[in-house]
Design a protein with these regions (language model features):
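N-terminal beta1-alpha1 ligand-phosphate binding loop
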Residues: 2-30
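A short beta-strand-loop structural module common to alpha/beta enzyme folds
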Residues: 32-42
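Cysteine-cluster motifs in flexible loop/terminal segments that predominantly coordinate metals
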Residues: 42-72, 200-205
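Short, hinge-like loop/turn segments at secondary-structure boundaries
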Residues: 51-55, 132, 161-162
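Glycine-rich phosphate/pyrophosphate-binding loop and the adjoining helix
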Residues: 141-205
Length: 205
């Protein structure tokens, strides 16, 4: 089994990376493979609403989003990490996840997911809420820890001093591994989620 992670920070080995790495270690100890994909520093386009993905089954902008989507099809779970920018998720990861979930959500449906957030001081829970909304609209079990998944520090070195934050990430990794194994056991026993066809309505009808 494999958990695919996204480092949504412009700093490849900063605080967000520390958080993801700590969760990855716990997953690895449970026999779960992990991969961390870095979002990079290059400008990332947001969703233009062109709806071409409905025909192409991928985003019309062929960049890291589509590369991640290909990996997502083979992954069993996900952890998305973001720094806090102005008390919310970083702009790049919002653009990334908007396009990823609009074009390739089927590749992630029913697969467990979590987000981790890094901040110097405040805005962590607001960012946490933003990222979790992608999972909860896509029928993805959300994995929790013993606290909200946040780590504090202005540098990677400072984040490594946040002992409670590091424990939160380890517990998250252990819980993710446990849920993945439960799902695998359920499938082996013939247990699958019961599906319903989506009903689309507007508020006025």
């Amino acid at each position: 089994m494999k958990v695919l992670m996204l480092n949504g920070s412009p700093h490849e080995h900063g605080c967000t990376y520390v958080a993801l790495s700590e969760a990855a270690k716990a997953l690895n100890e449970q026999g779960i493979e992990t991969e961390i994909v870095w979002i990079g520093k290059e400008p990332l386009e947001g969703c233009s609403g062109c709806a071409a993905c409905g025909k192409l089954w991928k985003c019309v902008v062929d960049d890291k989003v589509n590369e991640f989507a290909l990996k997502a099809a083979e992954a069993d779970g996900f952890i998305f990490g973001s720094p806090v920018h102005y008390a919310s998720a970083a702009g790049a990861i919002v653009s990334f996840m908007d396009r990823l979930f609009y074009s390739s959500s089927r590749k992630m449906t029913y697969k467990p997911a979590a987000c981790v957030v890094s901040c110097r001081r405040g805005g962590a829970t607001a960012t946490f809420d933003v990222l979790n909304k992608y999972f909860t609209i896509n029928q993805m079990p959300v994995v929790s820890s013993n606290y909200w998944n946040e780590i504090h520090g202005n540098t990677a070195e400072q984040a490594l001093q946040d002992l409670e934050g590091l424990q939160t990430m380890r517990v998250l990794g252990k819980n993710m591994a446990w849920l993945l194994k439960c799902i695998e056991a359920g499938k082996a026993a013939g247990v699958e989620p019961e599906k319903e066809k989506k009903i689309w309505t507007n508020f006025i009808r």
